[in-house]
Amino acid sequence: YNHLYWYSMGGNLIKQVTSGNYEVKEFLGWDADDNSFYYISNEESPLRQAVYQIDRKGKKTKLSSQPGLNSAQFSTNMKYYMNRYSNLNTPTVITLNDNTGKVLSTLVTNDNLKQTLSKYSVPQKEFFTFKTEDGVSLNGWMMKPVNFSASKKYPVLLYQYSGPGSQQVLDTWSISWETYMASRGFIVVCVDGR
């Protein structure tokens, strides 16, 4: 797993900052005033990412309040950050937060998009997990036509991209060609590789 390690300027390991069965997806910065590291990880689920703060003693605080895929851009003094999140049911929302996670202002809500989409039947992704023959758990999503009937046969498209550092199965909002194909009567399936 990718984790944060704290080194001296001379290259000597001081301590491992994070540990566990999850990955640190991005290091966001260090605040010398409160001796804290800020980062994004998938601690709650491999499908979700949240913003965290951890001090030098290991006290960790989750700063993101919304489930789904969160990303952050901190100010140069590490006192404020822009949080961008979405999930399967929520188009991108952007907030201005202080470094404790408190939302100071909501900058983008996408309310007009939500209102427009409420007038249409849009296929939705459904997550699933399965184990391979050798016991490895893989995550996937399936998108069925809106008027899906279990008694009918449908053509199936399997979307697969296993490029380096890629992950396609995430709790994030999108409308893409897969949505279009499901709206045209296809079942679309995606599974992340190992």
Label every PLM stretch briefly:
Residues 1, 7-8, 18, 37-45, ...:
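Beta-strand C-termini and the immediately following turn/loop, strongest in propeller blades
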Residues 1-2, 46-48, 91, 151-153:
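Short secondary-structure junction motifs
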Residues 48-50, 169:
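Long, heptad-repeat coiled-coil alpha-helices that serve as cytosolic signaling/dimerization stalks
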Residues 49, 57-84:
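Repeat-solenoid scaffold signature
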Residues 71-194:
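Serine-hydrolase catalytic core recognition
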